UniProtKB/Swiss-Prot annotation:
EC number in record: 7.-.-.-
Binding site for ATP: 40-47
Residue ranges of every copy of the ABC transporter domain listed in the record: 4-231
UniProt organism field: Bacillus subtilis (strain 168)
Stated name of the protein: Uncharacterized ABC transporter ATP-binding protein YtlC
InterPro entries in the record: AAA+_ATPase (IPR003593), ABC_transporter-like_ATP-bd (IPR003439), ABC_transporter-like_CS (IPR017871), ABC_transporter_ATP-bind (IPR050166), P-loop_NTPase (IPR027417)
Length: 260
């Protein structure tokens, strides 16, 4: 059985005046350690699907299974990393990083040492007693990654985590996240609008069409490209070829959206 099984998921939002189907008949599998990306026009249901996988929304139809069971935060310890770091400004970096362990009631001397040990791995030296406002945007996002990984999640969900950063910081964090997830054998799902980011970080890209969101096309990243650090992958001719292919498909979908 696959690690992540999305079984013909459809989700519809209802209001007093209308109903809107955000995603329709989404079906795919991902194995442990896979990195997959959702790419597509704005409003195609990528974040809705991510929320369904996280167990935050129950789908109107279909189901999601993680290791054969429906998503459950206590059982699966799902990690979420968002566009903003959402560090609590009144808490120190140490307190922020340990927050998930405290909430899950799994904070021990051993788990504390392991969590705080992530900080120097991520280039954050002597920051434990500092507060978020004392760190740069890139440093805060690194601290947020440490907080996300501290409870040892089985699945990591990334909702445009680099989009608010400058390009140099973004490239650096892409490498860091990629290397960390490979080292710890984490399964990850990335939502992004950035074609290059999706190619550089993923094993598989799901390109979504809009209204309602459906899987328009699936791109499997060549193994030699998927094994490279994102920065190195961006230099490869095969990266540019795949970028152009996906860009044309995405551009066609966006034109269709504008014409409706």
């Amino acid at each position: 059985m696959s690690f992540l099984h999305v079984d013909h998921v459809t989700h519809t939002y209802f209001s007093i005046k209308e109903k809107t189907t955000a995603v329709r008949d989404i079906h795919f599998d991902a194995e442990k350690g896979d990195f997959i990306s959702f790419l597509g026009p704005s409003g195609c249901g990528k974040t809705t699907l991510l929320s369904i996988i996280a167990g935050l929304i129950e789908p109107s139809e279909g189901r999601v299974l993680i290791e054969g069971r429906e998503p459950n935060q206590k059982e699966h310890n799902i990690g979420y990393m968002l566009q903003q770091d959402y560090l609590f400004p009144w808490k120190s970096i140490e307190e922020n990083v340990l927050l998930g362990l405290k909430i899950a009631d799994t904070l021990t001397e051993e788990s504390k040492a392991a969590a705080l040990g992530l900080l120097p791995e991520f280039g954050l030296i002597d920051v434990e007693k500092k507060y978020p406002k004392e760190l740069s945007g890139g440093m805060r996002q690194r601290a947020a990654l440490a907080r996300t990984l501290a409870p040892n999640p089985s699945l990591l969900l990334l909702d445009e985590p680099f989009s608010a950063l400058d390009f140099q910081t973004k490239l650096s964090l892409e490498n860091l996240v990629f290397r960390t997830l490979k080292e710890y054998q984490k399964t990850a799902v990335l939502v992004t609008h950035d074609i290059g980011e999706a190619i550089a970080m993923s094993d598989t890209i799901f390109l979504f069409s809009n209204q309602p969101g459906t899987i328009h096309q699936i791109f499997t990243i060549p193994k030699e490209l998927a094994a490279m650090l994102p920065f190195d992958a961006r230099q490869e001719p095969s990266f540019q070829t795949l970028f152009q292919t996906i860009w044309k498909e995405l551009n066609s979908l966006e034109k269709q959206q504008r014409n409706h």
